A protein has these predicted regions:
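Conserved beta-strand scaffold positions in the cores of enzyme catalytic domains, especially
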Residues: 32-34, 59, 87, 140-143, ...
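C-terminal catalytic/acceptor-binding lobe
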Residues: 109-227
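Conserved catalytic core of nucleotide-sugar-dependent glycosyltransferases
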Residues: 39-52, 60, 67-141
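Extended hydrophobic secondary-structure segments that form protein cores and membrane-embedded regions
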Residues: 6-10, 59-63
Length: 227
């Protein structure tokens, strides 16, 4: 992994205990950036521009309750072979719900990356469009991988995220994520949840043809390792 900076964006009015916790966890691995007022793509562009020393830049968004795989950044950097403006989307991910882990291939997932030239201009950054509208701004390169590249946590406080994946064994994530996966995979409970999940997905596909098109795009994505 090369030329990578992890920026943790926080509200300028964040409490002292929160700042202290971030400083304790950092160990030099990320930079905390205070944001005053409303945050948008313009604010993100200014933040990135102040730290930029290269002719092009890649920006990826990750929510603070989600995670990316150990090789996520390296995979994205390998795929960005030119400064041509486009989004790179690693299709294969997973969701963590109250009962377990669920496989979730999704070509419009929130973990998308924008590649763009930034020599004499303010970077647009990945925040220029919402992730499900990315193709309206620039071409999208969808790539598949042999393991989940991102982990989305589905919980009661996240009203915009729906648990729609197919149950998978939590141990498949262990080598790729540096976080504890708090769930068990008992045979009966796993089989029941897998069956119910498959039925739920089938119902969604029948009830929404656009979801079938989305699944087809995900399955047809190019393998990242062949680039």
């Amino acid at each position: 992994m090369r030329d990578f900076r992890w920026l943790v964006l926080i509200d300028s009015e964040s409490p002292h205990w929160f700042r202290a916790k971030l400083a304790e966890l950092s160990l030099g691995s990320y930079e905390v950036v205070e944001v005053e007022g409303a945050f948008d793509a313009l604010a993100a562009g200014r933040i990135v521009r102040e730290r930029l020393a290269t002719p092009f830049v890649l920006t990826t968004r990750v929510d603070n309750d989600d995670a990316v795989a150990r090789d996520f950044v390296e995979t994205i950097q390998r795929a960005a072979v030119s400064p041509e403006q486009r989004f790179i989307n690693l299709v294969d991910g997973a969701q963590l719900g109250p009962k377990g882990v669920y496989q979730r291939p999704y070509t419009q997932n929130p973990f998308i990356t924008l590649v763009e030239g930034a020599r004499n201009q303010l970077p647009a950054t990945v925040f220029v469009k919402r992730h499900f509208e990315a193709s309206k701004y620039a071409p999208v390169l969808n790539l598949r991988s042999s393991h989940p590249m991102w982990l989305q946590v589905v919980h009661g406080g996240n009203v915009l995220t729906e648990l729609v994946g197919l149950r998978m064994k939590a141990r498949r994530l262990t080598p790729w994520f540096g976080c504890e996966i708090p769930c068990g995979d008992g045979p009966f409970e796993f089989a029941l949840d897998f069956t119910l999940g498959a039925a739920r997905i089938a119902g969604r596909l029948v009830g929404g043809p656009h979801r079938l098109v989305e699944l087809g795009r995900a399955l047809a994505a190019r393998p990242a390792q062949r680039l």
